Amino acid sequence: MSTSDDIHNTTATGKCPFHQGGHDQSAGAGTTTRDWWPNQLRVDLLNQHSNRSNPLGEDFDYRKEFSKLDYYGLKKDLKALLTESQPWWPADWGSYAGLFIRMAWHGAGTYRSIDGRGGAGRGQQRFAPLNSWPDNVSLDKARRLLWPIKQKYGQKISWADLFILAGNVALENSGFRTFGFGAGREDVWEPDLDVNWGDEKAWLTHRHPEALAKAPLGATEMGLIYVNPEGPDHSGEPLSAAAAIRATFGNMGMNDEETVALIAGGHTLGKTHGAGPTSNVGPDPEAAPIEEQGLGWASTYGSGVGADAITSGLEVVWTQTPTQWSNYFFENLFKYEWVQTRSPAGAIQFEAVDAPEIIPDPFDPSKKRKPTMLVTDLTLRFDPEFEKISRRFLNDPQAFNEAFARAWFKLTHRDMGPKSRYIGPEVPKEDLIWQDPLPQPIYNPTEQDIIDLKFAIADSGLSVSERVSVAWASASTFRGGDKRGGANGARLALMPQRDWDVNAAAVRALPVLEKIQKESGKASLADIIVLAGVVGVEKAASAAGLSIHVPFAPGRVDARQDQTDIEMFELLEPIADGFRNYRARLDVSTTESLLIDKAQQLTLTAPEMTALVGGMRVLGANFDGSKNGVFTDRVGVLSNDFFVNLLDMRYEWKATDESKELFEGRDRETGEVKYTASRADLVFGSNSVLRAVAEVYASSDAHEKFVKDFVAAWVKVMNLDRFDLL
């Protein structure tokens, strides 16, 4: 019978022909636009984490809620939880300390300093892919163990903060003195889509360490936090793992001493789990059946838990006191000779061949075993540089304790931005260089001061383009991932930013603004730089016939060179900045994709990005003063000419060469070249989503709306790092 006959018969009997089974008829099912066009521009990344996904609503104030928290009562409850072993996931040696430390470590350890993404700041371990990574097996149990405490304290503590605090309490309850704890991590309610975890299509695909330097990746294998504990590509060779360890920890901003301290400290407590073959382990949480209720990796080996637990497949206990802090990791590492062996699951590990059975069994007090180590643990003994540090820690346990305390604090707070974002009673007083410290404000300009400064800037001889360019160069370094960069601190005037090619034109305005600062005697250069942008935008709007007030919040300060880690700030240098029509390299993605990347780092929406690009072009703010994308004969006037002329069908566009990076817009009738453009310009006419926004701003009634939207987005960027205004 034909399909039409089916429809006719079901209609005749009163049945809907589309409810008869067969195809998935649910929303979102079927072939998607990305299936048809896998290289489609990811404009959707700019719509992440909107209030529509937030069950707490846009008026929820986490800092305010946290202030109501019984902080030490929470820590007391966490301490009690550590030794309340649950039959559905029994605690090793009656303590969950090792499990909670691993949970915190693996939450924070996804951070990459190269792009500032990843890390523990949003509680992403709750969501895919991290909740189901091969390296995170059994951490679903750790998070579920925490649920009664999260339920008790509700919104006064975020999941993101709770994960890290649980790790801290686990260390403290094991006899270790931590460096401190800063809260302030706000939860999000869906997976981060912007993080590039790699392009591999299979878990645990090996990456060469050298490749990590060319991409924002933090691990040597897809699905690992750092390195393969069995050595590169399961080689079983401790020495060959050194390069991989340095690459991955280096991508987090850790030096050799911090790396050694973190590995040894993290492996002083707890154990790995490999009671039997990993083939007994079921699907991860994302793939597990609905009745598992978000848990995964159910094991059919024995009881599947406790002594029968399988996590990594490795079965390693490092120290004689796996629930109490000690220096046994280094003592065992150097005291014994190690022979390669395999775990019950078949994973490569090492055993101390000449050691007595001194390691307690986690569930049977009558049993002992020999010390065991991971392949990558032995790297700390056999790599010459790591060995020097390890022997120093062996002979000076206090130095090790201090190094681990600081490295752990850095690991767990690296993506939180400046210390001003930290809240809670245990925030350390010491300023640390990786926090990008700033001096305390000395003076806050009055309204009259601001008026006087604006007059001085207006009379300085700087053009609208120069004023806008210097302000943008200062503020646009901000990264929403780790909250680094921004205008506060005026680091545009310091190394390394003043020497970046992208800032060459912008820094030429600095002497003029520095003179104004000196003459004012009070205002910070950081405030004056941003105020220059205010004056430029207001003048450009006035030239367009609109009287616009650009909001300005004073209170920025000027950082010193000794407060600026040059190596770490080099990572903020843009590969591309489509807002300024800048691109340094052509071997990394497409120009339009890098524009989206930059906009996402600046936490912009698609309309905000569109308004800013259109405004920057007509204000003549290209990094090199080029005319690319300057679709106007009124440069310096805040008009919507960029959109009007981009969408004008009088012009056709042709690439100037085979690279298709630059284009000429020719009059269709005369063939005359009217405009030139980059891909960062033409994307607003090419991409269907961005064109829809551009059409709004190109409309005859949209000029005032465009100016207001540009100003709002501009002020947002200028204030991205003003955490003192929260």
Curated annotation (Swiss-Prot):
A GO-annotated cellular component: cytosol
Cofactors required: heme b
Pfam families: peroxidase
UniProt GO molecular function: catalase activity; heme binding; metal ion binding
Keyword list, A-Z: Heme, Hydrogen peroxide, Iron, Metal-binding, Oxidoreductase, Peroxidase
Similarity comment: Belongs to the peroxidase family. Peroxidase/catalase subfamily.
Job description of the protein: Bifunctional enzyme with both catalase and broad-spectrum peroxidase activity.
Stated name of the protein: Catalase-peroxidase
Gene source species: Shigella sonnei (strain Ss046)
Encoding gene (name): katG
